């Protein structure tokens, strides 16, 4: 893999004639999850404005095939603008069709696609490790809510409701996100005890090999939050693999 630096400073003409372009630009200011924060959620005028650089790249390279990925925008106007710029209608795909994680994303592509498969039967317990270090378990009090529901318990901490949720291993995981502290990591009830999902579990939920993110940067191993955030910001591998399989048609 060759890195070509900052997207804002790149000379796209050098890549003219490449056959395939894959793009997934910053989604923070498009996300419905963060719509309550006007400081963050300002659509394509915010951090997600890097989308327009990706469009510049698409027009300069003129690849035979392309795929753009992004969250469901909080604004219909943003969705319309993105679709007009890319030039094809998006398809909404939930990665639960391919993995143990529900993750709805829009994909804009001119790759010929077949019929979407039925939802995968995989759930959280199917990819959980046999044994987990004690450091991943919470010492905080928790309350069992309803073992027949996906959110089966609640951690007793001073944080927003979403961050207190403990998930039932008999269901699929909800959408992974980046981690910024404050109990943002996803939680599961494991043998009657609440714990945070491990880095390996985050990787498996995205369809990646174990310890895919166990790497060093500037001589230091990536932290738990950095590794999980990479997964939260990344693509679901089996979903993208299915889309790219259309190139064989």
Could you say what each language-model-derived stretch is?
Residues 1-249:
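Conserved active-site and SAM-binding loop architecture
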């Amino acid at each position: 893999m060759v890195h070509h630096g900052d997207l804002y400073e790149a000379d796209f003409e050098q890549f003219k004639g490449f056959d395939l372009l894959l793009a997934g630009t910053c989604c923070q200011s498009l996300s419905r999850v963060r719509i309550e924060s006007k400081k963050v959620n300002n659509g394509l005028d915010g951090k997600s404005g890097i989308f327009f650089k990706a469009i510049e790249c698409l027009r300069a390279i003129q690849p035979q095939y392309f795929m753009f990925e992004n969250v469901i925008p909080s604004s219909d106007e943003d969705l319309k603008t993105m679709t007009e710029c890319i030039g094809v209608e998006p398809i909404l795909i939930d990665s639960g069709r391919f993995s143990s994680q529900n993750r709805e994303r829009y994909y804009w592509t001119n790759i010929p696609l077949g019929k979407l498969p039925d939802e995968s039967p995989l759930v959280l317990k199917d990819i959980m490790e046999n044994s987990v270090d004690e450091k991943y378990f919470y010492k905080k009090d928790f309350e069992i809510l309803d073992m027949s529901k996906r959110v089966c318990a609640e951690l007793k901490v001073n944080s927003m409701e979403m961050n207190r949720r403990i998930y039932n291993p008999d269901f699929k995981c909800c959408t992974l996100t980046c981690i910024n502290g404050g109990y943002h990591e996803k939680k599961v009830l494991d043998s009657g005890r609440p714990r945070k999902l491990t880095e390996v579990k985050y990787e498996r939920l995205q369809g990646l090999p174990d310890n895919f993110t166990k790497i060093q940067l500037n001589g230091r191993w990536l932290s738990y939050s950095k590794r999980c955030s990479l997964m939260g910001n990344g693509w679901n591998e089996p979903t993208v693999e299915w889309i790219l399989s259309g190139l064989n048609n």
